[in-house]
Amino acid sequence: GWGGDTSWLRQRAHPDEAKLFAAEDEAQQRMIEDSVGKGLSRDVLPLKPTFVTIKFGMNDHSYQKFRPDIFKAYTRSQSQLQKVLSGAGARVSFLTPQPIEEKRADPDQDVRNQSLRKFSDGLKQVAQERGAGFVDQFDPYMAIMMKERASDPKAFIGGGDAVHPGPAGQTIMAWAVLKGLGATAPVSSASITLPAGGVETHGCKVGKVAVSGGGVSFDRLDESLPFPVDERAEAALKIAPILEDLSRYELGVSGLAAGTYEVLIDGESVLKTDAEALKKGVNLSNNAGPITKQARELLGEVFKKNNSFFHRWRDVQLYSFPGWAQGAETEARRSAELKKLDEEVVARAIEVLK
């Protein structure tokens, strides 16, 4: 969204915010209904969504200690968002904000984080009342921050800045969100027993098993790729159980003689390990090699698709022309550009699905 967006779908610098917070119940509700209705009608409802995640709170709490007047506007706005979206046929899941990550040893004592925690608790209550989904990013992110600060008071887990995490922090957020939405860990697994070459599989097909020279070779065709991790975010894997919780791309081989073994995919080395580890099973989700390369190529296509939509929305649909340039001809050109960009987004989405 725009920098500074809030759950009532206006930027926090809007001149009427003080009026909104001070308004009596009915007046405040009318203001929220008007603002939310306009925003969703412009940006969301035309897309005919079937499932919508909503994440507000960081800007809403206004970067200060807890204020009941802002909190009331926040919970009312979230409720109104769900009401409008569900009325249009969409399922809704609310996501809490992540904590603010200042470089201090006790981020849980930051009054802004204490406020965000209260906002998150209020959001959970809204979700329960409205029958919506709810995902808590705040607690898992805070738990990792506290753990890292305990060993290094200067640890900074998110990258980016205190409010805008970089790729590592975004990946931790994605982990918390996907877990909260019920994503499961298994991608695929193949377990081979030597010397007979018996095979057990999940999510893949294995054939042409050949046992020779103390090792084994086979063909494996997976139904899906493992969870792609942005190379800029690999630090997140060291501090959160992301692959364990979301991406188990596994290989097991039992019956090997004791010793060290090399795992190769399409002739490319992806792991060196021992017989005991292979017997237990190894997770190859983010090991360098052809599978990770494919997953990252897919992630790159997702980025391209998302960037195309962002450009379409922010740079074209929301672009505000100066008064002298406004008019029917300008809007016709805008509509033509939106049509062209819609086609581009669809084309990129098709590339993702290939």
Which residues fall in each region the model found?
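A short beta-strand-loop structural module common to alpha/beta enzyme folds
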Residues: 1-8
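Short, surface-exposed amphipathic charged segments that create phosphate/polyanion-binding patches used
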Residues: 12-16
